[in-house]
Every structure is written in C-alpha cells, then in structure tokens.
C-alpha cells in the first residue's frame, strides 16, 4: 500500500532522498542462544537504491506517522515483524537533520531472533551477530551510521540500596530482604536489553551484579542473570572496589568483547560521593533509568 510519504524529496543541493516526509528504519536487536546480540538486516533487492547491499528494514514516513510508527510499520511490511514483539529503546537521526529531510533509526529489542517473512524489497533477511556486521557489504548510509548504533558489552554494578530507595515510599524498609529480592527479580526479568549510556552510545546488558549490605544480604536471589556481592561493611566501599578491580567478572559480559568493543563498567547509583570515587572510564547511571525498565 502506498502512503503519502512515498516519493522523492529534493534537498537544497538538488540531491534526491526517498521519503517526502523523511524516512525511518528499525534496528531490531535480539539475544542469540549464547547471549550475544544479533541485529536484523535485509539484503536489498537489486532494483532498489544501492541494491545488493545490507541495511535495516525501513522506508518513507507518512505525514500522519511518528518515526517509531513508520519504522515498525516498515519492518512489518518488509520482514513480517509483529509490532507486539518490539520494545523501542531509543531514536537517532542518522542522516539529514530535523526540520528538513531526515532518516531516523529506531533502536529496539526483541526477546529472541524472530521469524521473518520477506517481501519484494529484499532478497534475504538475516539475523547477524553485531561483531559480523562490519564485514558485510553495507548500504553506504547504514555503514556510516553503524559505529554509533552498535552496542558495547556492559558490566553493570547496582548500588542496590540506592536503587531500592529510589522506588519511593513503598514500605520496602519493613521487609528489606523481601523488597530487595523482588526488585532484583524484576530487573533480571528485563534482561537482556539495549541500554542508552550516559555518553550517548549504546550498551548491551545481559546480566547485573548487585551489591547487598546490612539486612538486605539475606535476600533470596535465584535468577542467573543476577550475581550478588555481599558487603561486610559499606556497600559503597564494595562498589568502589568492584569498579576499580583490575580483573572484572567477565562472566557478566558477552564472550565476544574485543579490543574494538571493550566492556564498559556502569555503576547504577545516585550517590554523589560514590560517583566521585569511581575510576576514570567508569560510567554512572541514575537509578531512575533502571527503574524505567520495570
């Protein structure tokens, strides 16, 4: 079905770009059986623009659509992706600029590599490991944008007491072990996932490490997506020690971390004093960002 966005937009330089109202594509990421992320790519039909190259499902945005709606619709039309299996994480303008013609990449996750159904705009659809994408013949626009869209493995450390306190007056202090266990179970259930990092890049979180102190140390945690560190004294001291450790817990990051994609350590805390103690290169993430997953 043709929409009112189908057609060429002509820029001030005379260049033609597809999509009267701009265009959007869906970068859909999902965990493979080994826990590492794969993305859905299409091999563009030979008759299309830059045919024979790999890119994201996407196309022109209609005037009544948001960029998210357009990207999800195009993924359904071109790859048979069910919108109910798509969890949107972020949007990025990866070509052009807002206010004129632009291409927006919608970053999203699926719970697993989904089955696909190809239409005439592709000659193949494939779930490709992130570490394999650069070796493929990519559409020029996607190749230029890929470095800002790919994820880095994340080693995520939770200041659990601080995150629990950020949930508000829920009465968690009456049963701190129970509330801690419930919180960690909810966080684990949201993994693995793409996370937008404070520096504007993206990370892949497959597991978290939670530091427990005081009465919370007796919390029952059974999900293997959560590793527990019990602090004998201050939880902040334990978090600072873990963040500064020369040899991180590599089981908390995918096995494909390379020199190109080194794992980044992220500490989830709003504690200013703890943030100031973190080593150079460690990122701090607000508890509200993680609570937003739930």
Which sequence ranges carry the predicted segments?
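Short glycine-enriched, charge-decorated loop/helix-capping segments at active-site entrances
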Residues: 55-60, 170-174
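General small-molecule cofactor/ligand-binding pocket signal
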Residues: 89, 126-128, 229, 285
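Nuclease catalytic cores that cleave nucleic-acid phosphodiester bonds
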Residues: 165-294
């Amino acid at each position: 079905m043709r929409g009112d966005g189908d057609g060429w937009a002509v820029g001030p330089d005379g260049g033609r770009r597809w999509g009267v109202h701009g265009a959007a594509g869906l970068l859909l990421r999902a965990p493979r059986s080994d826990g590492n992320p794969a993305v859905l790519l299409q091999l563009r039909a030979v008759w299309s623009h830059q045919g024979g190259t790999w890119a994201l499902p996407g196309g022109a945005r209609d005037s009544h659509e948001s960029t998210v709606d357009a990207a999800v619709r195009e993924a359904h039309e071109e790859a048979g992706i069910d919108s109910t299996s798509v969890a949107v994480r972020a949007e990025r303008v990866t070509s052009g600029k807002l206010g004129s013609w632009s291409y927006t990449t919608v970053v999203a996750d699926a719970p697993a590599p989904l089955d696909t159904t190809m239409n005439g705009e592709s000659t193949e659809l494939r779930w490709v490991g992130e570490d394999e994408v650069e070796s493929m013949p990519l559409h020029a626009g996607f190749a230029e944008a890929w470095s800002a869209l790919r994820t880095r493995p994340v080693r995520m450390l939770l200041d659990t007491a601080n995150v629990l306190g950020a949930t508000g007056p829920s009465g968690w202090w009456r049963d701190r072990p129970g509330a801690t266990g419930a919180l960690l179970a909810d966080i684990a259930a949201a993994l693995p996932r793409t996370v937008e990092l404070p520096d504007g890049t993206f990370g892949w979180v497959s597991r978290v490490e939670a530091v427990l102190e005081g009465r919370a140390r007796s919390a029952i945690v059974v999900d293997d997506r959560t590793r527990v560190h019990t602090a004998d004294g201050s939880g902040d001291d334990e978090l600072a020690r873990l963040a500064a450790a020369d040899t991180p817990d590599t089981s908390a990051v995918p096995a494909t971390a390379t020199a190109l994609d080194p794992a980044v350590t992220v500490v989830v805390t709003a504690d200013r004093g703890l943030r100031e103690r973190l080593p150079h290169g460690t990122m701090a993430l607000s508890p509200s960002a993680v609570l937003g997953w739930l």
